[in-house]
From Swiss-Prot:
GO cellular component: nucleus
GO molecular function: DNA binding
GO biological process, one term: regulation of DNA-templated transcription
Biased composition (Polar residues): 167-189
Compartment(s): Nucleus
Protein name in the entry: Protein REVEILLE 7-like
Portion annotated as DNA-binding: 87-110
Function: Probable transcription factor.
SUPFAM superfamilies to which the protein is assigned, alphabetical: Homeodomain-like
Length: 336
């Protein structure tokens, strides 16, 4: 007895009919069966077309327009008449819309009114006055500014006139500060009252880019300290001694032969002095007499000079230095 076993298998449902159909078509082409009627049923073809079409996702509107009701629009018009463009106050008046929504609605409403202004008749609709735009707020401090510095003391009129003539900038420093900074230019001497300064003629000197007032005194200053006078005389005596020593060591007559002036310091001092003409002229007469006595031949140039001639030259140089010191004392300027 033969037992026959029949295995029944269910047909597999393919999830991708398009792929299966393409495989069948390719197998038919390979076998040579190009007939369109073979293996194609009208029922299966319609089912295949339906599966091919993809379903689009529904379009979700993320931002919906806020619709204004008639009541809200009427409140909006009332608030515009009351508050103009005060959006916060209009928001409180309406109660259901935000300030941003009210401002956008007003912009659309105003543009619509401007377009319909020509076609609209005056009697049909009441004219709504569009409020003018609010002025922009100016910043209280747009950029930092320097506060004006109050001047403690006004500059004298003579200084301003001289600065206009010289085209130099005015100094912001006070008079006391300038005195402290320029102490090295002034000598340690007691100053007189302001009345004496005003009576004396004043001249200006530009010193390191600053204008300095100098009071010229016609008469010799009477008030000097004894210590200052002693220091000045000591310095002058030391300077005169150094000058005589250099003249003796180098030889004045040799320099006269070469054409250089050994008494250059004496001549510079004599050029600067104007008031003491008589003593300087007498001293120069003595020097000229000494020059006439000496000759420029090499015999006189070499060797030492007589003792009497050296003494006379020392007297001349000492007298010149004393005259120069007296003139310096008389021409001392007051710098303020």
């Amino acid at each position: 007895m033969v037992m026959m076993i029949i295995i029944y298998t269910e047909p597999e449902i393919s999830l991708f009919p398009l792929q299966d159909r393409s495989e069948e078509l390719s197998s038919n082409v390979e076998n040579g069966s190009c007939n369109s009627n073979e293996g194609i049923n009208p029922e299966t073809s319609s089912h295949w077309i339906e599966n091919v079409v993809k379903v689009r996702k529904p379009y979700t509107v993320t931002k919906q327009r806020e619709k204004w009701s008639e009541e809200e629009h009427d409140r909006f018009l009332e608030a515009i008449k009351l508050y103009g463009r005060g959006w916060r106050q209009i928001q409180e008046h309406i109660g259901t819309k935000t300030a941003v929504q009210i401002r956008s609605h007003a912009q659309k409403f105003f543009s619509k009114m401007a377009q319909e202004a020509d076609s609209r008749s005056e009697g049909s609709v009441k004219a709504i006055v569009i409020p003018p735009p609010r002025p922009k707020r100016k910043p209280a401090h747009p950029y930092p500014r320097k506060s004006p510095v109050p001047y403690t003391q006004s500059p004298p009129p003579n200084l301003s006139a001289m600065e206009k003539g010289t085209k130099s900038p005015t100094s912001v420093l006070s008079s006391f500060g300038s005195e402290d900074q320029n102490n090295y230019t002034t000598s340690k001497q007691p100053f007189k009252d302001d009345s004496d300064i005003g009576s004396t003629p004043i001249s200006s000197i530009t010193l390191f880019g600053k204008i300095v007032l100098v009071a010229e005194e016609s008469h010799k200053p009477s008030s000097y300290n004894d210590d200052d006078l002693k220091q000045m005389t000591c310095q002058e005596n030391h300077y005169s001694g150094m000058l005589v020593d250099t003249n003796l060591s180098l030889g004045v007559w040799e320099t006269f032969c070469t054409g250089s002036n050994a008494f250059g310091s004496v001549t510079e001092a004599s050029e600067n002095l104007e008031k003491s003409a008589e003593p300087i002229s007498s001293s120069w007469k003595r020097l000229s007499s000494l020059e006439k006595q000496g000759s420029c031949n090499p015999v006189n140039a070499s060797g030492f000079r007589p003792y009497k001639r050296c003494l006379s030259e020392r007297e001349v140089t000492s007298s010149l230095t004393l005259v120069a010191s007296d003139e310096k004392k008389s021409q001392r300027a007051r710098i303020c």
